[in-house]
């Protein structure tokens, strides 16, 4: 599998966190809460062996931030 993509995007009534591989999205009242949830999700997935990337989009549509969470390296 490749990198799991997680997006934080503005909505009319809050901020959404969505993933390419999941149909349902989560909605938060603030961008900060959505970003925090997305980063925690990405870290959990990475710890489970699924590298993830979070992309945070601003209200105007511009990319506001990009974060990578890599899977831990296997010990030799």
Residue spans for each PLM region:
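Short aromatic-glycine-(Arg/Gly/Cys) micro-motifs in beta-strand/loop hairpins
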Residues: 1-25
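Conserved short hydrophobic patches within well-ordered secondary structure
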Residues: 8, 17, 28, 42, ...
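Surface loops and adjacent helix of pleckstrin homology
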Residues: 20, 30, 68
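Surface-exposed loop/edge segments in extracytoplasmic proteins
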Residues: 23-28, 62-65
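Short, surface-exposed beta-strand-loop junctions and turns on beta-sheet-rich folds
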Residues: 23-26, 34, 71
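A short, polar/proline- and glycine-enriched secondary-structure boundary/capping micro-motif
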Residues: 27-30, 76
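A short, charged, amphipathic alpha-helix used as a generic interaction element across diverse proteins
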Residues: 29-51
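Short, mixed-charge low-complexity intrinsically disordered segments
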Residues: 46-76
